[in-house]
């Protein structure tokens, strides 16, 4: 993997990780169009550590508050407030993707990274996001969050294992279907992603140097630079998205997904871009 490839792919990762447009899908598309290869699931997972650090820093106060409340709540029942419950919801919501990620890790590395699968998921899931935006009441705030919401959003997060779906797209959509307000759906989805993405990145670190499939391999310095680029751009992206969702809806991202997906389907159908 050249330094130019590292910079471009890391930028794509950082800019799209938190947007409901699928960062893994964009990495697959960008690497196939510009570099005639696949960045690989391992490079994707490791570079996500940069965006993971970004979301941890952005939500640092929330994380400290939730952890503190959770620990105190375990010791003193009277301290079991909203933040205490939120800590449990994050734990509960993380379980589904951890289980499925372990069972289907080989499929994630290979078959589902076929560009036909990626682009189809990009287009089809646009309809799900649009429907969630249309039917979501957005009347429920954090005080009304329940463990059932955590289970549903956690299951929705497992859809992000398929490149092209989008982790934030699936969790925000699930939140909207449950009636959560748009900003809460996004914030809870990001908190839910922290343990899953961190575990995925560490688990995939060895494979990023020596891919088990035909992905592009990167050196240690290249992975470090990729992680730093993804961190800076990811921090910018998450701050922008949360401000954006306060005043705007998800249809903007739906339109973008359909436009990119349709264009890629044409390129694939005409043989301009190879699917594998």
UniProtKB/Swiss-Prot annotation:
> Which reaction is catalysed here?
di-trans,octa-cis-undecaprenyl diphosphate + H2O = di-trans,octa-cis-undecaprenyl phosphate + phosphate + H(+)
Membrane topology (UniProt):
Multi-pass membrane protein
What EC class is this? Answer: hydrolase
Q: Which UniProt keywords apply?
A: Antibiotic resistance, Cell membrane, Cell shape, Cell wall biogenesis/degradation, Hydrolase, Membrane, Peptidoglycan synthesis, Transmembrane, Transmembrane helix
Where found?
Cell membrane
According to the UniProt entry, its GO molecular function terms are: undecaprenyl-diphosphatase activity
Q: Where are the transmembrane segments?
A: 84-104, 115-135, 188-208, 222-242, 250-270
GO biological process terms on file: cell wall organization; peptidoglycan biosynthetic process; regulation of cell shape; response to antibiotic
One GO cellular-component annotation of the UniProt record comes to: plasma membrane
Q: Name one Pfam family in it.
A: BacA
Q: What is its EC number?
A: 3.6.1.27
Q: Which family does it belong to?
A: Belongs to the UppP family.
Other noteworthy facts: Bacitracin is thought to be involved in the inhibition of peptidoglycan synthesis by sequestering undecaprenyl diphosphate, thereby reducing the pool of lipid carrier available.
State the function annotated in the UniProt record.
Catalyzes the dephosphorylation of undecaprenyl diphosphate (UPP). Confers resistance to bacitracin.
This protein is called Undecaprenyl-diphosphatase
